[in-house]
Amino acid sequence: ASDVTLNSFAEDVTVGECCDCVDLTTVY
C-alpha cells in the first residue's frame, strides 16, 4: 500500500496483498 496509514495497518494485521485492494479503493 502506498498510503502510510494503510501500510502500517497491513503490517499490524499482517494482511500483505489485501492492503493493496484497500489502498486502491481509498485512493481511487
From Swiss-Prot:
EC number: 3.4.24.-
Keyword annotations of the record: Hydrolase, Metal-binding, Metalloprotease, Protease, Secreted, Toxin, Zinc
Gene Ontology molecular-function annotations: metal ion binding; metallopeptidase activity; toxin activity
An example Gene Ontology CC term for this record: extracellular region
Tissue spec. comment: Expressed by the venom gland.
Gene Ontology biological process terms from the UniProt entry: proteolysis
Primary residence: secreted
Cofactor(s) for this UniProt protein: Zn(2+)
Cofactor note: Binds 1 zinc ion per subunit.
Subcellular localization(s) per the UniProt record: Secreted
Family that this chain belongs to: Belongs to the venom metalloproteinase (M12B) family.
Name of the molecule in the record: 50 kDa venom protease
Originating organism: Proatheris superciliaris
